[in-house]
Regions:
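Acidic/histidine-rich catalytic neighborhood
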Residues: 18-21, 25-59
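Acidic active-site catalytic centers that drive phospho-/nucleotidyl reactions
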Residues: 2, 26, 161
Length: 189
């Protein structure tokens, strides 16, 4: 990856164009600490419950509440369970129905799957954990170019703050979002 980015930097320089280059990841990765995965269908009856990936989409409010209560009572230290409306603000779910309900948040480096026979259980690692709980989930951020101050270092920040930064570099009007434009302001020339 380093060689590819280096090649891109050289090509940008050779072009003579005023290009700002931003290298960012949406998340980190973490190796599973063990194979003691959480299989939701071994904890609660999910027969007939629509799901996509590790998201559950019960069709009625009663089903959502029943699954939530059954998972909550397990009091398993490997995960937290929330109703969608109660997900902690730092996770930026904002009640979006695409997230499913209830929401299961891993608290340890173990896979959380809907089905015990999921391909996920054969994986060696994954992403999706809260970076405040698991530092390996933190993303990378590098920026350089004519609109970026060289040598400026910023601390860890949430990716929701990138929107204002990139829109500003492009001269675009910024819409309402969860980011804080002050976070990356020190990087701008």
């Amino acid at each position: 990856m380093d060689a590819l980015i280096g090649d891109l930097q050289e090509r940008i320089k050779a072009s003579g164009l005023p290009v700002d280059l931003i290298v960012v990841s949406d998340h980190g990765m973490i190796a599973f600490k063990d194979r003691n995965f959480v299989a939701l269908d071994k904890m609660v009856d999910l027969q007939g419950v629509p799901e996509v990936g590790d998201h559950l989409y019960p069709e009625t409010e009663a089903e959502k509440e029943k699954i939530y209560e059954e998972l909550k009572v397990k009091d398993d230290p490997r995960f937290a369970v929330y109703r969608l409306k109660d997900v902690p603000a730092q996770l930026h779910y904002d009640g979006n129905a695409r997230e499913g309900d209830p929401v299961v948040e891993p608290l340890e480096a173990v896979p959380v799957t809907v089905h015990a026979n999921s391909a996920e259980t054969r994986s060696k690692g994954d992403h999706g954990w809260d970076p405040q709980l698991m530092p390996d989930m933190k993303a990378i951020f590098y920026a350089e170019g004519p609109d970026v101050k060289p040598g400026v270092k910023v601390g860890t920040f949430e990716n929701v703050n990138l929107y204002d930064f990139v829109a500003g570099l492009l001269g675009l009007k910024v819409g309402k979002n969860d980011g804080d434009k002050k976070v990356l302001q020190p990087v701008r020339r």
